[in-house]
Amino acid sequence: MPKLRSATTTHGRNMAGARALWRATGMTDQDFGKPIIAVVNSFTQFVPGHVHLKDLGQLVAREIEAAGGVAKEFNTIAVDDGIAMGHGGMLYSLPSRELIADSVEYMVNAHCADAMVCISNCDKITPGMLMAALRINIPVIFVSGGPMEAGKTKLSDQIIKLDLVDAMIQGADPKVSDAQSEQVERSACPTCGSCSGMFTANSMNCLTEALGLSQPGNGSLLATHSDREQLFKLAGQRIVTLAKRWYEQDDASALPRNIATKAAFENAMALDIAMGGSTNTVLHLLAAAQEAGVDFTMADIDRMSRKVPQLCKVAPSTQKYHMEDVHRAGGVVAILGQLEKAGLVHGDTRNVLGTSLVELLAEYDVSRQPSQEVVDFYRAGPAGIRTTKAFSQDCRWPELDLDRAEGCIRSLDNAYSLEGGLAVLAGNLALNGAIVKTAGVDEENLTFRGPARVFESQDTAVAGILDGTVKAGEVVVIRYEGPKGGPGMQEMLYPTTYLKSMGLGKACALITDGRFSGGTSGLSIGHVSPEAASGGTIGLVEDGDIINIDIPARSMVLEVADSVLAARRVAVEARGWKPLDRQRQVSFALRAYAMFATSADKGAVRDRSMLGE
């Protein structure tokens, strides 16, 4: 029978000093021997997805203590990718994932906590906490802050839904008036919560459901809705149950590595492909799998992308549907339900509720005669009131969206495509692969061939797009922006946004060893591996080289003779794999990150082989 980890600090005369300190935090004799559960919060006033989390840690803590545990809360950092976008701040976004994972490990292991509730929400916070949870392998439940309500405004006598990306596009489009740009800006982000489309934050929070580490509705129920309070309360209650299953009953199925198995990672990837999730999720799933000791690679993603259909199109791929609409259609469970009917997910995976996926679908899938309580839960909708407060409204849709032909979530018979919303491309330009969000690519752009226009940084690419250097028909190549070369693998949302604002959104392709925001759409291919700084072929491309992209064939080829590439490689190796004439201040912290960073095909995690592992 495993003993409580916290017993190391609470039992024995030699731990008198530790107990004295625990007493100073409010613990009593009756608490020594109870599981100490870390409430890992991520409240910050910098990020709308986290601004409402301040009191939610204590909400969870009260439930933990009522259920027989001892709750101890601490906070992690949280970077807002939207605010950090387009300047040097974006260099810090992806590295913050590793810092979050390490800080959770440091706190939990230093104080010998027995279990965790992870209160996450935005882009790098959920994956950072997920990496830590699988690394430490003690009972855990994830509960996110929830998505933002979609913005709404009236343009051309029509009410349209908005999000952050709309504000960026309008602001960059010289044809849009100042008044209209400001109107969209003021309407795009109306409430607290993670940005309202199927961007990285919401994609990851949905994937925690498929991994079995969060409760139904975690990824889709609005931050503002009163029903979300119950998710937090239940998380506090259920984590105590999980802790007791492990420490009192020796039930190893309560541990995250026995929940997030290879089959669960395949379920999560199937969900991601079906719902057209952010390409960043590929990075984060690969990284999390390594922490879990699961053999899950780009080859698995490529295999699955060829057989899992795309069942959803959500913003930024369309303005029609946002996360509030996904929830109305039954949320993650409804998508998994469609995949389960086709045999595309593993029904025997387990979850933090203690059930199998098949059992969870029987109770929560809105297409399988659920209880009225479940129906009402998925009817939770937006109020349209600007607020930064959680649980501040209780509006409900008049009815669910059960239209599986043309609704938000489609059946396999009505899928947008039989091959899903993400694809892995390979070829001499990306020997270890690259990722494209096919859900955001128009059919006419699934194949593209054109001359390269090469930039050594995101900054010069933006300037080249806005000053007219980039022409229709070209393939924009942005390199030395990978995990090592950036460093930090910046998101390229501004280049893709400005291509659209300049009328080039469908006339150009973009290839990079950097990554893309979940808000990106169009023919945008990222995660090119190996990256330029690691000797990848993308570092050998020159202006005018012809690049041939064929998404249906999963190929991306640089049409340059091998002998020419070999000669270029000799020249680049002589000067070093680094950008020419790029002026960028890189801090010591970022240089340290770059030293250990691997390319995107490995999840951009640190290279353990450098430590002799």
UniProtKB/Swiss-Prot annotation:
Keyword field: 2Fe-2S, Amino-acid biosynthesis, Branched-chain amino acid biosynthesis, Iron, Iron-sulfur, Lyase, Magnesium, Metal-binding
Cofactors named for this entry: [2Fe-2S] cluster; Mg(2+)
UniProt-annotated binding residues for Mg(2+): 81, 123-124, 491
Catalytic activity: (2R)-2,3-dihydroxy-3-methylbutanoate = 3-methyl-2-oxobutanoate + H2O; (2R,3R)-2,3-dihydroxy-3-methylpentanoate = (S)-3-methyl-2-oxopentanoate + H2O
Keyword Protein biosynthesis attributed: no
Chain residues that bind [2Fe-2S] cluster: 122, 195
Cofactor binding remark: Binds 1 [2Fe-2S] cluster per subunit. This cluster acts as a Lewis acid cofactor.
One GO CC term, this protein: cytosol
GO molecular function, one term: dihydroxy-acid dehydratase activity
GO biological process, one term: isoleucine biosynthetic process
EC primary class: lyase
Family: Belongs to the IlvD/Edd family.
This protein's name: Dihydroxy-acid dehydratase
Naturally occurring in which organism (per UniProt): Aeromonas hydrophila subsp. hydrophila (strain ATCC 7966 / DSM 30187 / BCRC 13018 / CCUG 14551 / JCM 1027 / KCTC 2358 / NCIMB 9240 / NCTC 8049)
Lineage: Bacteria, Pseudomonadati, Pseudomonadota, Gammaproteobacteria, Aeromonadales
